[in-house]
């Protein structure tokens, strides 16, 4: 009989964890607070306490070929960037296809997870749950925490003097659902993240006036990239990652800023980040630049002070007659069912080895799935995290010593601060991270070997999109359809758009894409070498 594993949450992280446990012969029991799977992607017309909440118009920022489970592509006719209802439809189909629903206890709230008295030798946990007012406790050999990090809103009211005197409505973006109730209103959105920009542009169609207040600015990217292809299929590549991590810093930074300004010059729109070379996750919004051009959205600096009816910005300008302030100020990390000694934090950083395992426990029998954030998609990331975690729980994989894990955490955190900034503690380099995890379980593709044995596939794997299928090519959980999925991914990305075919479809040429991007720096390097 396999080890018993408690899984908290039935979103994409929880479903991936159930499947990974089954692949390793473990016995999963998943506890889900609501009455359905999907987590973040399950829309509700009201925000529920202790559960992620989205607005009705949410679309994905990752394209379908880059955000699927590695052995379960999205249907061919699904659009590249999907409405939340389409993603929920896909999640349900995945759960049914993999026969996962029978392992989930719905409407069950996990109230506490505690070490058993003999934890130092057994690694076991007491898990207490509540359902219909009744409490139950059970012993589990391991726990996988899949409750997400978009649950507890960060609403820093103390950072805004005078907010307590403001007479209009004031709430966090998690409580925003649709724009109709803001017809003719004057709205201030605080925060220039994905939610803030989405809400501001959506409200601009019905509200009288909309302003966005940003403390530090942000890069704003379009989902549509060169020649109309999805951005991530062109930018999230192994070759691109190699260049980014090996070019001289000055050239890498210059290229990054040039890439971010390819669509429009951010400085002219008041969007330029304070430190533009930091690789903080950009905002994905196709409407914001046009909304600013048309004057229906204005960008302002940080709010210095609120009055009863207005906001005074740091540049001295005033937005008067405000009806509503929406704080799109992100979320805080919290695991209320766990003792603080289990998952420690410091300086807004949760201390986890590779973003998954608490390093200071006697036994590595608790894992956090879905806590990292990157330019890559969540679903393939949590799939790989859960596969690794399941192997560690089973005993197939072993972790380094506590000292080695802490040294790795400290080293990585220094690199993160340099690359992403001090506040972006859960950001990571997607391909580097995925290769690291896949190497632990023997699922990392061997690129040199591929070039020798299957050059056609190797070219697509190295120069093409780093799609999820790459991490089911070899090793445990290998998917026989992975090779074909990689070679046909461009066809699937084009199919939903070909409702009026006007010519022969052509795949992008990776060589010319990168040559165009690096033409100037290559020329500069050549001149430098000649002169020296």
From Swiss-Prot:
The keyword S-adenosyl-L-methionine does not apply. It is found in: Microsome membrane; Endoplasmic reticulum membrane. It is a single-pass membrane protein. It holds the Pfam family FMO-like. Its EC number is 1.14.13.148, 1.14.13.32, 1.14.13.8. GO terms for cellular component: endoplasmic reticulum membrane. GO terms for biological process: taurine biosynthetic process. GO terms for molecular function: albendazole monooxygenase activity; flavin adenine dinucleotide binding; hypotaurine monooxygenase activity; N,N-dimethylaniline monooxygenase activity; NADP binding; trimethylamine monooxygenase activity. NADP(+) binds at residues 60-61, 195-198. PANTHER family: DIMETHYLANILINE MONOOXYGENASE (PTHR23023). Essential hepatic enzyme that catalyzes the oxygenation of a wide variety of nitrogen- and sulfur-containing compounds including drugs as well as dietary compounds. Plays an important role in the metabolism of trimethylamine (TMA), via the production of trimethylamine N-oxide (TMAO) metabolite. TMA is generated by the action of gut microbiota using dietary precursors such as choline, choline containing compounds, betaine or L-carnitine. By regulating TMAO concentration, FMO3 directly impacts both platelet responsiveness and rate of thrombus formation. Belongs to the FMO family. This is Flavin-containing monooxygenase 3.
């Amino acid at each position: 009989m396999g080890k018993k594993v408690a899984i908290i949450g039935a979103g994409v992280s929880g479903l991936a964890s159930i499947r990974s446990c089954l692949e390793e012969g473990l016995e999963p029991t998943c506890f889900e607070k609501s009455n359905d799977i999907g987590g973040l992607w399950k829309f509700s017309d009201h925000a529920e306490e202790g559960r992620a909440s989205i607005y009705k118009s949410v679309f994905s920022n990752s394209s379908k070929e880059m955000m699927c489970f590695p052995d379960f592509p999205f249907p061919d006719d699904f659009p590249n960037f999907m409405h939340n209802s389409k993603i929920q439809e896909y999640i349900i189909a995945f759960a049914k296809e993999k026969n996962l629903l029978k392992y989930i206890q719905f409407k069950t709230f996990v109230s506490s997870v505690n070490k058993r008295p003999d934890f130092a030798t057994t690694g076991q946990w007491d898990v207490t749950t509540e359902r219909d007012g009744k409490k139950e406790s059970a012993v589990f050999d391991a726990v996988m925490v899949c409750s997400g990090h978009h649950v507890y809103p960060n609403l820093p009211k103390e950072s805004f003097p005078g907010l307590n005197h403001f007479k209009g409505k004031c709430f966090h973006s998690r409580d925003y659902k649709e724009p109709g109730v803001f017809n003719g209103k004057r709205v201030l959105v605080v925060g220039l993240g994905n939610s803030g920009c989405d809400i501001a542009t959506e409200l601009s169609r019905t509200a009288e006036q909309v302003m966005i207040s940003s403390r530090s600015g942000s890069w704003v990217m379009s989902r549509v990239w060169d020649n109309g292809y999805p951005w991530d299929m062109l930018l999230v590549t192994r070759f691109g990652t190699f260049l980014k991590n090996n070019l001289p810093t000055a050239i890498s930074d210059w290229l990054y800023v040039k890439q971010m300004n390819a669509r429009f010059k951010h400085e002219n729109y008041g969007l330029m980040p304070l430190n533009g070379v930091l690789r903080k996750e950009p905002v994905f919004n196709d409407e914001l630049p046009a909304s600013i051009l048309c004057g229906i959205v204005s960008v302002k600096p940080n709010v210095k002070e609120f009055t009863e009816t207005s906001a005074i910005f740091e540049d001295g300008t005033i937005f008067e007659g405000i009806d509503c302030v929406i704080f799109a100020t992100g979320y805080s990390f919290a695991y209320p069912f766990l003792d603080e000694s289990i998952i420690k934090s410091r300086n807004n950083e949760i201390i986890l080895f590779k973003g998954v395992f608490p390093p200071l426990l006697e036994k590595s029998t608790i894992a956090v799935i879905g806590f990292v954030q990157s330019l890559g998609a969540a679903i393939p990331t949590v799939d790989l995290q859960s596969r690794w975690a399941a192997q560690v729980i089973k005993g197939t994989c072993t972790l380094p010593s506590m000292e080695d894990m802490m040294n790795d955490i400290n080293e990585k955190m220094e690199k993160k601060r340099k690359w992403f900034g001090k506040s972006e503690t859960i950001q990571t380099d997607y391909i580097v991270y995925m290769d690291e995890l896949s190497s632990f379980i023997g699922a990392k593709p061997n690129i040199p070997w591929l070039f020798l044995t299957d050059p056609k596939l190797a070219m697509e794997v190295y120069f093409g999109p780093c799609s999820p299928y790459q991490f089911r090519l070899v090793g445990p959980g290998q998917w026989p359809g992975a090779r074909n999925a990689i070679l046909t991914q461009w066809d699937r990305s084009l199919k939903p758009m070909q409702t009026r075919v006007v010519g022969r479809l052509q795949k992008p040429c990776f060589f010319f894409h990168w040559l165009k991007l690096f033409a100037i720096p290559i020329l500069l390097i050549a001149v430098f070498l000649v002169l020296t």
